[in-house]
Amino acid sequence: MAEKEVKDIDSLIDQGLNTENSELDLREKELDDEDLIKVLESDKVKGVTALFLEFNDIGDEGLKALVASDKMKFLTALNLFKNKVTDEGVKALAKAKTMLNLSELIRSEEH
């Protein structure tokens, strides 16, 4: 079994963060649930209103962590196109009490 490549999460955040527009672009970074959880632990992401995660390997656990993160409570746009989120993750998002500002969600049917 191949070892998982350790990613420099802080560097990825710095590269993808647009503070002027409060956007975080992490598309095509080969992120999985564990990586997203590390992103959510960073204070740099507090106040982000748009999160672009398309073409990664994020699944239900990553989405549940995102939903539970107080730092993401201002999120208005979330792009999960071409990830591994199933109906279970979408249900967790729908039941979330923290993401009341979310008005745009993009996801694909494939997982």
Language-model features and meaning:
Residues S22-L26, T49-L53, L75-L80, L102-R107:
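Conserved hydrophobic beta-strand positions in leucine-rich repeat
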Residues K64-E88:
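Charged low-complexity stretches with an acidic bias
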